[in-house]
Amino acid sequence: MKPIQVIDSHTEGNPTRVILSGFPIPKNKTLLERVNYLKKKQDHLRKILNHEPRGNGMMCSVLLMPPMIKGCDYSVIIMEQDEYVPMCGHCIIGTATTLVYAKKLKQKKSPVTIKFHTLAGIVECKVHIKNGNVDYVSFVNAESFLLHQNYKIKTKNYGKINVDIAYGGDYYAIVSADKLKIKLNLQNDQEIIRCANEISTEMLKKKFPHPKNKKINRCYMVQFISNKRIHNKNNSKTTVVAPPGAIDRSPCGTGTSARVAQLFSKGKLKLNQKFHNEGPLGTKFIGKVISSKIENKILYIRPQVSGRAYITGIN
């Protein structure tokens, strides 16, 4: 097997590993077919890249490929600890930062525009450069929406819980940590994971088909929210738990998209109003709704999320 060349970064605390070469690219015609091929034939490579000893508990890898559709710069497959996900915000910010760092783009003038073809749709990034270095990245995410309010589930140790189910490139069960009296700090990680796993187990018992893509139908991500913030200038604190129990160190890009969709649908966020979403480490993403529309009684929004990434290694 050829060596796999990667560049590592972290986005507001959460790692991304961008694959530049050495990884066999599937030859299937559609992005979904390529993902399914990797699941069946090459999943060992995902584990090699993401798991110990080469990876860690939150490592995510991004496979860069030539664009499969017109109007995009790259098609990408996003590989997490346990899943191939439709979209990942912190990975997109890390990937955009990596491409500028590695001088893989023709455009030099800030902001540099990059369009990624993901399973969730086309994601457009703008990389803002200051003094020759990446300052921050903004991306316009796939259409996001609130699917269910106060969806009731019953858990073993936490009783009946009301969750909001929102989509921001992936489905999230959004839960009030304050109501459950769960403290969102790193010292309380085991209780956070335990509760998230109980919620995720219940959510996976039912499918939630995406109104426009029935193949997206599983809600396995859990997003805890709280008003008890580290920095008072931020609007809310969040902790996202991904299967099989990994805490996202960043405020989570798709989770932020789902959150602003939830707030906008409830009338708690206005168009173009900035929402400062604080993660477990006190770092933040800034989300806002840049457009909205109603189709078949569902309010869809187009979210923009901004954050920063930093190069940590070349391997």
Where are these regions (language model features)?
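A glycine-rich beta-to-alpha transition motif near the start of alpha/beta enzyme domains, typified by
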Residues: 1-164, 176-315
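Glycine-rich ThDP/TPP pyrophosphate-binding loop and its adjacent helix/strand module
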Residues: 169
